[in-house]
């Protein structure tokens, strides 16, 4: 009985596929500039550290910030002007209602001269034109406000793009220095998501079937991890191999080489 158990164990061991994989961050992002400008600060001492809400790269945004203040002041003034004009419009609406009513009353009166009637008519038309002009001015101001809101949003995005933040990511590499002028698409930094880790292996064609159901052993120890991603398209570099990835908990130390075995149990 013991001999049978040993034989079964040896068969399972021989049947297991052995791979080696480096523990890598879950994601490494290449950060490029969305704007042009002068780099004010790029703190290389942050490399290897987990970043906070504070910017790790700052591109000069002084003029953008001043312009945004001016735009927001204009928005406030236009908003106040619209409110005043809308109050004027209400008054003009009431005035027009009275003038229309008065004109309807005097128009059929025979003892009123045509000159008096014309005067009332011209006064009514003038008031109606004033009402329409005020309404038109409100519409124009609202268009200006809409344009300024768009400008404010664009400036806010530019300012954000010039103050780079990557909270909870690790600064993997700094690619610019303070005093450097950058343009759109200039590489700035690399940041890593270390909240999880990944192991990448390349399977032979015959190993792809049921690979996600296999039991994974890491450095000889059975784990609860399974293959998380499996491509059914052969890798462009590792010819006739199929990439598989295992997502694992974040380790204390990355870049270690681990031995992986895929077994039936």
Model region roles, listed by residue range:
Residues 43, 47-72, 156, 160, ...:
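Short hydrophobic beta/alpha edge segments that flank linear recognition/processing sites
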Residues 18-20, 168, 175-178, 184-187, ...:
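Hydrophobic alpha-helical membrane-insertion signals
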Residues 17-41, 149-168, 190-191, 228-236:
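Short beta-strand-turn/beta-hairpin segments enriched in glycine/proline and small hydrophobics
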Residues 38-50, 169, 173-176:
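Short histidine-centered loop motifs in beta-beta connectors
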Residues 102-128:
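Extended, EK/Q-rich alpha-helical coiled-coil segments that serve as long dimerization/scaffolding arms
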Residues 3-13:
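Sec-dependent N-terminal signal peptides
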Residues 73, 80, 122-166, 180:
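Extended amphipathic alpha-helical segments
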Residues 31-34, 46-108, 134-149:
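Long, charged alpha-helical "stalk" segments
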């Amino acid at each position: 009985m013991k001999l049978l158990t040993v034989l079964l164990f040896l068969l399972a061991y021989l049947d297991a596929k052995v791979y080696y994989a480096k523990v890598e961050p879950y994601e490494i992002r290449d950060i490029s500039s969305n704007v042009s400008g002068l780099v004010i600060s790029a703190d290389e001492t942050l490399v290897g550290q987990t970043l906070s809400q504070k910017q790790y790269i700052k591109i000069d945004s002084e003029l953008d910030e001043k312009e945004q203040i001016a735009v927001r002041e204009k928005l406030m003034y236009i908003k106040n002007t619209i409110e005043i004009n809308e109050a004027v419009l209400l008054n003009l609406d009431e005035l027009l209602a009275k003038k229309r009513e008065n004109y309807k009353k005097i128009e059929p009166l025979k003892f009123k001269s045509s000159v008096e009637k014309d005067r009332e008519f011209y006064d009514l038309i003038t008031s109606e034109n004033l009402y329409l002009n005020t309404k038109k001015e409100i519409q124009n101001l609202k268009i200006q406000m809409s344009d300024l809101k768009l400008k404010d949003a664009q400036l806010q995005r530019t300012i954000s793009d010039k103050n780079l933040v990557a909270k909870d990511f690790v600064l993997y590499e700094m690619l610019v220095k303070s005093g450097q002028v950058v343009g759109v698409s200039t590489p700035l930094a690399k940041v890593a998501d270390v909240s999880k880790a990944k192991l990448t292996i390349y399977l032979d064609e015959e190993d792809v079937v049921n690979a996600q159901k296999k039991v994974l052993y890491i450095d000889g120890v059975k784990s609860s991890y399974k293959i998380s991603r499996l491509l059914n398209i052969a890798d462009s570099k590792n010819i006739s191999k199929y990439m598989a990835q295992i997502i694992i908990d974040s380790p204390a130390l990355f870049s270690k080489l681990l031995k992986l075995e895929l077994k039936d149990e």
